[in-house]
């Protein structure tokens, strides 16, 4: 019994240490978006698209074991960061994307270089007409988009 309790304690401690509260900010040479926070705005049922603005963004949870970024949603639901075609969004659907960090830079499926700040993206509520939206293009990003990287700031593990 002592072994099982000790083993369970180690496993639970490791799981807690793997979860980290973070915020995301923009790294860019462009002064319009440089240092701005990444937040998310409602665009559909259980779906929030990522936008850039302000200096204080929401707190997300990064789970290094699951390689996922999440945030609490309504009731007992959780939203996960996902790339939906080119739109970056928080969704109640589980993401198949793999999120890691190279230093403090967010990597999607191993790349830190394919994030963009774009306007007029065709998002459902047309928020991108006046705000930069975070988009992901593995290739052929529109020339009007700004190349960005997403950097984390955070605390130590959750408890």
Where are these regions (language model features)?
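Signature of small four-pass
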Residues: 71-103
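Generic alpha-helix signal with a bias toward terminal, lower-confidence helices
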Residues: 13, 36-38, 50, 81, ...
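Intrinsically disordered, low-complexity boundary segments flanking structured domains
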Residues: 10-11, 56, 137
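Extracellular glycan/ECM-engagement signal in secreted proteins
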Residues: 20-46, 91-159
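Fungal secretory targeting signals
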Residues: 1-21
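Short, well-structured hydrophobic secondary-structure segments
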Residues: 41-42, 47-84
């Amino acid at each position: 019994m002592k072994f099982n309790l000790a083993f369970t304690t180690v496993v639970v401690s490791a799981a807690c240490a793997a979860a980290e509260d973070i915020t995301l900010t923009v790294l860019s040479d462009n002064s319009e978006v440089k240092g701005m926070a990444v937040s998310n705005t409602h665009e559909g049922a259980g779906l929030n698209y990522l936008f850039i603005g302000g200096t204080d963004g929401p707190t997300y949870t990064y789970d290094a074991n699951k390689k996922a970024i999440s945030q609490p949603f309504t009731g007992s639901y959780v939203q996960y960061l996902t790339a939906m075609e080119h739109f970056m969004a928080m969704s109640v659907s589980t993401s198949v994307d793999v999120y890691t960090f190279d230093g403090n830079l967010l990597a999607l499926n191993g790349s830190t270089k394919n994030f963009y700040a774009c306007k007029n993206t065709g998002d459902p509520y047309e928020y991108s007409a006046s705000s930069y939206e975070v988009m992901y293009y593995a290739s052929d990003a529109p020339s009007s988009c700004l190349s960005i990287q997403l950097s984390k700031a955070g605390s130590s593990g959750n408890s």
